[in-house]
């Protein structure tokens, strides 16, 4: 397939990230397949992790923050009895302890302490920044930085299965939750230590897992040309479906796309954000913000260029 240098292509790709690649490496692989002029991911997955990584192409990058802020769901296997330097299986083993015998009731009591709103201390091996540098860079130098506790919400935590020394959990959580820290903290609650053996992101922002594809699948489709690839793009407005929908008549659409405030066809609370569409074509225009009886431009797409 002969490829142009870069092209204007807009939409969201649901990638099933393979193990061993950083999120940025995976993004660049997909970006090159699409030859997309602009691209960005929506929240990093560690190289050890697999699963859903929504990638925003073109104008969709304007809405990537909403996917970054969205709830996420994971399937994780926690190895009990061993603490590691990194909190996952790639680190050096620091301690080994015997795993206590647990009844279903005693285990459930411990797991219940990790449901709802909880506090976490972010791990040193994380991309969280301190004075402009990610924490993992300090950790690799043996430097420990004091981190503040963070409140996160675990909306669901289900025990899927267990063995004598592993727990497999299905976890749905808010933005900023470190599953690795949950694994380590469960190990401490059990008194034996633990680390993350595997991590798979099932979904982000309610996107269905059956809609994501592997790199190999995208590479095979790329052999058929851009039209085949573009058929697997998800429209960018799905990133902001949680906002109320507003349809504008043609005259207001034109004014809005020129950056002008227009009358609001709906009554919503002041400063509410809405997703806007042209009434006739149902074309997504971007986001607006309610100002009294009007809507002002908030985050608009470039209608002269976008393809979805």
Swiss-Prot record:
Gene3D superfamilies: Pseudouridine synthase, PUA domain. Belongs to the pseudouridine synthase TruB family. Type 1 subfamily. Keywords: Isomerase, tRNA processing. The gene is truB. InterPro entries: PsdUridine_synth_cat_dom_sf, PsdUridine_synth_N, PUA-like_sf, PUA_sf, tRNA_psdUridine_synth_TruB, tRNA_sdUridine_synth_fam1_C, TruB_C. Its EC number is 5.4.99.25. GO terms for molecular function: RNA binding; tRNA pseudouridine(55) synthase activity. The active site is at residue 46. This is tRNA pseudouridine synthase B. The lineage of its organism: Bacteria, Pseudomonadati, Pseudomonadota, Gammaproteobacteria, Oceanospirillales. The keyword tRNA processing applies. It comes from Marinomonas sp. (strain MWYL1). Responsible for synthesis of pseudouridine from uracil-55 in the psi GC loop of transfer RNAs. It comes from the Bacteria.
């Amino acid at each position: 397939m002969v490829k142009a240098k870069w092209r204007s292509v807009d939409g969201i790709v649901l990638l099933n990230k393979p193990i061993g690649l950083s999120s940025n490496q995976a993004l660049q692989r997909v970006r090159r397949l699409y030859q997309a002029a602009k691209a960005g991911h929506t929240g990093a997955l560690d190289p050890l992790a697999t699963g859903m990584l929504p990638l925003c192409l073109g104008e969709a990058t304007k809405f990537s923050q909403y996917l970054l802020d969205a709830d996420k769901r994971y399937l994780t296997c926690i190895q009990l009895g061993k603490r590691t330097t990194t909190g996952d299986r790639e680190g050096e083993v620091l301690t080994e302890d015997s795993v206590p015998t647990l009844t279903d009731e005693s285990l459930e009591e411990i797991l219940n302490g990790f449901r709802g709103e909880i506090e976490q201390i972010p791990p040193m091996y994380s991309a969280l920044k301190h004075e402009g540098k990610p924490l993992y860079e300090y950790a690799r130098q043996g430097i420990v930085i004091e981190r503040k506790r963070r409140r996160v919400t675990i909306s669901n935590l289900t025990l899927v299965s267990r063995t004598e020394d592993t727990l497999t959990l299905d976890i749905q959580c808010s933005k900023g939750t470190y599953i690795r820290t949950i694994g380590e903290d469960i190990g401490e609650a059990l008194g034996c230590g633990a680390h993350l053996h595997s991590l798979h992101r099932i979904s982000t922002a309610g996107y269905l897992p059956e809609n994501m594809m592997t790199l190999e699948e995208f590479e095979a489709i790329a052999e058929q040309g851009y039209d085949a690839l573009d058929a697997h793009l998800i429209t960018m407005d799905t990133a902001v479906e949680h906002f109320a929908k507003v349809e504008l008549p043609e005259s207001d659409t034109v004014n809005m796309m020129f950056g002008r405030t227009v009358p609001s066809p709906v009554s919503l609370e002041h400063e509410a954000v809405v997703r806007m569409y042209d009434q006739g074509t149902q074309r997504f225009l971007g986001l607006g913000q309610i100002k009294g009886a009007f809507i002002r431009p908030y985050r608009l797409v470039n209608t002269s260029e976008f393809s979805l």
